[in-house]
Amino acid sequence: MSFLSAEEKNLVSGLWGKVNVDEVGGEALGRLLVVYPWTQRFFQSFGDLSSADAIMSNAKVKAHGKKVLNSFSDGLKNIDDLKGAFAKLSELHCDKLHVDPENFRLLGNVLVCVLAHHFGHEFNPQVQAAFQKVVAGVASALAHRYH
């Protein structure tokens, strides 16, 4: 049984098809690093993260944000099996990178804010509610290896 209704799946896929993954990915990761500065410790090799401007213009942040959102896109293709879709990434982030799984929830919430900013009125309460479910599901799937 899916955690999303058919209508919610349509809302998510309809909006996601319009997302510029390159732009939104970099912005979401950048905002995470600005708003939650302790997350920067995982990205020390990215160079200058000394200010919000430095983070938001950092090419490595943008590139990794794109990579993150491409993985998110791949997961959306398997929306009814997020744990399976994100199993390898969960293992990587748990066993090798030792990322606090709370960071997945934080990034999901930042992503929702970035989508709202980019899509304005199109990101209505129904779309937001559907995306909140999706990012919670993805965060749970990424944290699965930790349990």
From Swiss-Prot:
Q: In which tissues is it expressed?
A: Red blood cells.
Pfam families named among the record's database cross-references: Globin
> What cellular component terms from Gene Ontology apply here?
blood microparticle; haptoglobin-hemoglobin complex; hemoglobin complex
InterPro entries xrefs: Globin, Globin-like_sf, Globin/Proto, Hemoglobin_b, Hemoglobin_oxygen_transport
Could you tell me the keywords of this UniProt record? Acetylation, Heme, Iron, Metal-binding, Oxygen transport, Phosphoprotein, S-nitrosylation, Transport
Q: Which domain of life is it from?
A: Eukaryota
Under Gene Ontology molecular function, one entry of this record is: heme binding
Q: Which PANTHER family match?
A: HEMOGLOBIN FAMILY MEMBER, HEMOGLOBIN SUBUNIT BETA
Assembly and interaction partners: Heterotetramer of two alpha chains and two beta chains.
> What else does the entry mention about this protein?
In the cat family (felidae), the oxygen affinity of hemoglobin depends little or not at all on the association with diphosphoglycerate (DPG).
Q: What does this protein do?
A: Involved in oxygen transport from the lung to the various peripheral tissues.
| Protein's UniProt name | Hemoglobin subunit beta
Q: Which organism is it from?
A: Panthera pardus orientalis
